[in-house]
Amino acid sequence: MANLKDKIEAEYENIDRLILKLPEKEKLPFLEFLQLAGVATILHNFYNGVENILKLILIEENIPLPVGSSWHKDLLKLAEEKGIITKITREQVGEYLSFRHYFSHAYALDLYAERLEPLVENLKEVYSRFRKDISNFLDE
């Protein structure tokens, strides 16, 4: 379990460093195209970090990871079912999964500050809730 906690902590450190790079929500409408693309990349990476942590825990618990075309969404459902995260965390993190999917399949030209604003605004709260859920699960 110590090795798992070290791996999770490394993911947290990466996420923490990303969050420090995010501009305030109010500044988003004034960002240049490449800056908006950078913000979108940070949001995408945040979700990837969350997913990495969930996969680490499921593997440690010997729970098979979902497969198939909807495995990302199924991973969140499985994490909730196994008590790793709460329903509200699954729903909130799911917003970042939806954005990750959009970002991965859209042209950067289709990025708009209005779409990023709620994700930037809520990121710290969602991340805090996620960390609390993970801590509660690991401490059981």
Model-derived features with residue positions:
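Solvent-exposed interaction patches of small proteins and small membrane subunits
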Residues: 1-140
